[in-house]
């Protein structure tokens, strides 16, 4: 009789150890299906890359293993590194404690604004083709916490439901520990009575205890590691949803090797960005441009308006009333007007929307804030045009991808003709733009790149008074024409999205920066 309590205790201890260590290879959990009948899934190895989903499977729900059946890379390091850096963990980045001490809203913002770009770049085209063959798809993330991947899977991939690991929280902050599967419910009530098919990789299935959700599937298709190595990168034009807006400072995929290179570059980058800033702020353009080139900055001008003697050569384009020229450009970084000023070899004024006072103090050219009141803004811009040239970015905010936001028609009512300027830039390590509270560091981050590059293309003047079919075009129509011409020169796609749309998507606000920041 005394052996029965011991047997029960030993059996309970054995079950605890088994849950912690996982099942040995080639063994699987035996759990209840959604219908309540215990089942084993049929495992189909070597799922062909040209696997076509027939009509019978379309009516079933696909359980998609995100790491095994969608992403090409098996390394999860870059995604945790992105959360650690973009959520401002500061010194905790060095020890890679990604979630420790972070608030939920900060991690959610990184997952919404930064991670989708890197997930899209890691998607395998072959895996996405299989996902598109199903009307209902449930995403299963075995290793990446749900909060990191849910927004991407629902907003960009259109998945119905996401099941993933949860990170434990204490008093509203993460403690960096993952909850066990037994500590939560799957929440599959919506799939009650629906046949399910699983899709993942062989490596994930046999390397550890597989997720209980796959025991609810009738069949599980597994891709071999050899097949997955042949997966191709998903082209941008095949993204499930266009990637127009994204945030974050890192312009590269933070693999362990790339992250180590960045950390080794940082000490030199800090000194380099200070040097470059001082050069552009304090020295004449004729001196600062060669010095900048010597430090690794690449600048290229197309259709330069500067003649051989260093004077602006607009020739017959000069306006008879001696007013300044209004340059209209797309918006890539805070330095757009500065580069135009450098290429013109003279000081210009720039209209800005919401920039920090630090950026205004460090600007080598005069900046004037727009009030978003058309009458007041027109009143401010008129005297500036009487004194000299003026640069305005009608988009009102930057866009990193090959898209143009809607152009504000304010500039159309000021002058009879405008001078479009098409801008393109490259950053190989850090982005010089942000929607976060550290916008005052934008130009510092841009100058921290080893080889930042800018291309400034001056275009033919365009009239603001346009008549088509006997009707004078409205101001917004003229603004759309200017947008289309710049987009054609750059190969960018014009959109109707605005500054407000960008900040609501990425930051949850309307993008107004406090001048005291």
Language-model features, listed with the residues they occupy:
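Catalytic core of membrane glycerolipid acyltransferases/transacylases, capturing the structured
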Residues: 152-169, 281, 299, 318-375, ...
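C-terminal cap/substrate-recognition subdomain and adjoining C-terminal extension
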Residues: 1-27, 33, 47-48, 115-254
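A metal-dependent, Asp-based hydrolase signature
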Residues: 73-133
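Active-site neighborhood of HAD-like aspartate-dependent phosphohydrolases
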Residues: 49-90
């Amino acid at each position: 009789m005394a052996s029965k309590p011991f047997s029960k205790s030993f059996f309970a201890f054995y079950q605890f150890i088994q849950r912690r260590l996982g099942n040995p290879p080639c063994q699987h959990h035996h759990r209840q299906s959604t219908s309540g009948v215990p089942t084993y899934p049929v495992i189909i190895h070597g799922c062909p890359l040209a696997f076509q989903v027939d009509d019978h499977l379309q009516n079933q729900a696909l359980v998609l293993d995100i790491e095994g059946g969608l992403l090409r890379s098996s390394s999860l390091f870059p995604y945790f590194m992105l959360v650690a850096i973009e959520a401002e963990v500061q010194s905790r980045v060095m020890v890679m404690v990604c979630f420790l001490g972070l608030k939920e809203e900060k991690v959610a913002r990184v997952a919404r604004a930064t991670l989708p770009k890197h997930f899209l770049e890691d998607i395998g085209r072959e895996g996405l083709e299989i996902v598109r063959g199903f009307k209902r798809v449930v995403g299963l993330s075995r290793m990446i916490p749900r909060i990191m991947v849910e927004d991407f899977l629902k907003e960009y991939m259109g998945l119905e439901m996401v099941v993933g690991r949860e990170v434990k929280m204490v008093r509203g902050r993460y403690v960096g520990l993952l909850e066990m599967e037994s500590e939560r419910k799957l929440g599959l009530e919506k799939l009650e009575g629906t046949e399910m098919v699983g899709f993942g990789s062989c490596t994930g299935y046999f390397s550890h205890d597989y997720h209980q959700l796959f025991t609810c599937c009738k069949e599980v298709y597994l891709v071999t590691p050899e097949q997955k190595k042949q997966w191709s990168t998903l082209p941008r034009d095949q993204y499930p949803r266009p990637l127009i807006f994204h945030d974050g400072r890192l312009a590269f995929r933070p693999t362990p090797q790339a992250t180590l290179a960045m950390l080794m570059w940082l000490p030199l980058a800090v000194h380099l960005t200070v040097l470059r800033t001082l050069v552009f702020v304090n020295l004449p353009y004729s001196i600062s441009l060669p010095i900048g080139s010597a430090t690794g900055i690449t600048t290229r001008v197309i259709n330069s308006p500067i003649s051989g003697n260093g004077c602006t050569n607009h020739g017959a384009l000069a306006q008879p009333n001696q007013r300044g020229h209004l340059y209209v450009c797309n918006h890539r970084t805070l330095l757009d007007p500065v580069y135009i000023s450098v290429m013109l070899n003279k000081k210009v004024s720039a209209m800005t929307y919401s920039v920090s006072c630090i950026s205004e103090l460090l600007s080598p050219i005069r900046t004037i804030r727009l009030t978003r009141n058309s009458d007041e803004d027109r009143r401010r811009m008129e005297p500036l045009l009487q004194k000299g040239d003026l640069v305005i970015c009608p988009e009102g905010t930057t866009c990193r991808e090959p898209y143009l936001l809607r152009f504000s028609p304010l500039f159309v009512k000021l002058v009879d003709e405008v001078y479009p300027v098409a801008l393109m830039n490259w950053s190989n390590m850090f982005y010089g733009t942000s929607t976060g509270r550290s916008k005052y560091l934008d130009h510092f981050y841009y100058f921290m790149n080893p080889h930042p590059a800018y291309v400034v293309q001056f275009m033919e003047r365009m009239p603001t008074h346009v008549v088509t079919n006997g009707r004078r075009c409205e101001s917004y129509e003229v603004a759309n024409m200017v947008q289309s011409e710049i987009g054609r020169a750059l190969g960018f796609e014009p959109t109707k999205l605005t500054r407000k749309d960008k900040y609501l998507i990425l930051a949850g606000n309307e993008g107004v920066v406090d001048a005291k920041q």
